[in-house]
């Protein structure tokens, strides 16, 4: 009779039947076969593969062990079994995507039923096995595939990937000074050419607070003709659309400010660090200076939507769910 078993990695398949012929019809890799006689003793232990037949050995039960999770098929009985090579055509197709994060990580687990996997990454990606390593951007034991290049994996073993060692995600870098802006809505800020970028909040962060940060520099000494020791107040902030990028309502997020009680700024670096709670999907972010200082108006005629004394050097996040470098598209075929 033909026996079909679905086994987990390390599992045994045992069949109690008298016979003297055994044929492995379907299997991936090596199996360990044990055959037992009428007295319960082990009459045979050997490694077998797909297509192997053992004839003329009397047994009352057989046991097969696999190192891989897979479906196996075998013949046990007195009659001989005529083996025919199994088709390699796929019977199951599944598509999904994998978030690409920092470090060497698993892309595909070991899967004995996997026939092939077609993969496309939006960023340069290195592919390798369990021995692949990466240190300071140098990858050993992996092959590079260019961004947008589709490639196939035809092995059933585990597959690792590497795209970056960066543990943060930089959304935007700026060299120009931020503009002064009040919360007058998205349309008004865009009409006045306030710089922005879009952030795509994943479903896992829908309504969940996450950290959004910026390295911020304030420099006012001698800028735009301002006196070297003029006191200037600052309060950098993010204005973020409440809904998607077409929503006009903006939410203000800020974490620090300084009133003009000092003798001017000269490369005073700070970190704007806020906890943001947004719905899943795309939101528009405006990094702005919200404090229009009296002296800036009186001495150098600054006004709303002019360049301020504040520069957002880079806006970034170290939240694990936002440090995704992209999503690999995978089409999986199984036998």
Curated annotation (Swiss-Prot):
Pfam families tied to this protein: Phage_spike_P1 (PF22188), Spike_JR1 (PF22464), Spike_JR2 (PF22465)
Keywords tagged on the record: Virion
Intrachain disulfide bonds: none
Gene3D superfamilies: 2.60.120.720, 2.60.120.770
Subcellular location, principal: virion
Compartments it resides in: Virion
Statement: the UniProt record of this protein carries the keyword Plastid: no
Taxonomic superkingdom: Viruses
GO cellular component, as recorded: virion component
Comment, domains: The C-terminus is responsible for receptor binding activity. The N-terminus is associated with the capsid vertex.
Known role: Receptor binding protein located at the fivefold vertices.
SUBUNIT field: Monomer.
Name this protein carries in UniProt: Spike protein P1
Species whose genome carries this gene: Pseudoalteromonas phage PM2
Gene that specifies this protein: I
């Amino acid at each position: 009779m033909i026996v079909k078993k679905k086994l987990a990695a390390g599992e045994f398949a045992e069949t109690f039947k008298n016979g003297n012929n055994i044929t492995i019809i379907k299997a991936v890799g090596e199996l360990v076969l044990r055959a037992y006689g009428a007295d319960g003793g082990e009459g045979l232990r050997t490694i077998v593969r797909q297509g192997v037949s053992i004839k003329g050995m009397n047994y009352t039960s057989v046991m097969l062990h696999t190192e891989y999770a897979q479906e196996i098929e075998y013949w046990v009985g007195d009659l001989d079994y005529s083996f025919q090579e199994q088709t390699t055509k796929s019977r199951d197709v599944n598509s999904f995507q994998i978030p690409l994060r920092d470090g060497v990580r698993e892309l595909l687990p070991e899967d004995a039923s996997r026939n092939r996997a077609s993969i496309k990454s939006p960023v340069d990606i290195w592919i390798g096995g369990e021995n692949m390593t990466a240190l300071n951007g140098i990858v050993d034991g992996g092959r590079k595939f260019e961004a947008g290049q589709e490639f196939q994996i035809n092995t059933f073993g585990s597959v690792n990937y590497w795209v970056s060692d960066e543990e943060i995600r930089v959304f935007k870098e700026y060299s120009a000074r931020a503009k002064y802006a009040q919360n007058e809505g998205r349309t008004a800020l865009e009409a006045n050419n306030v710089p922005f970028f879009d952030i795509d909040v994943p479903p896992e962060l829908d309504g969940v607070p996450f950290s959004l940060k910026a390295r911020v520099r304030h420099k006012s000494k001698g800028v735009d003709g301002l006196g070297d020791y003029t006191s200037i107040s600052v309060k950098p902030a993010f204005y973020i659309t409440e809904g998607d990028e077409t929503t006009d309502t903006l939410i203000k997020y800020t974490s620090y400010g300084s009133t003009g009680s000092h003798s001017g700024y000269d490369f005073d670096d700070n970190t704007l660090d806020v906890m943001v709670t947004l719905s899943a999907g795309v939101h528009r972010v405006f990094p702005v200076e919200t404090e229009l200082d009296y002296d800036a108006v009186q001495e150098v005629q600054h006004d709303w939507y002019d360049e301020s004394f504040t520069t957002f050097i880079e806006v970034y996040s170290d939240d694990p769910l936002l440090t995704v470098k992209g999503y690999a598209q995978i089409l999986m075929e199984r036998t």
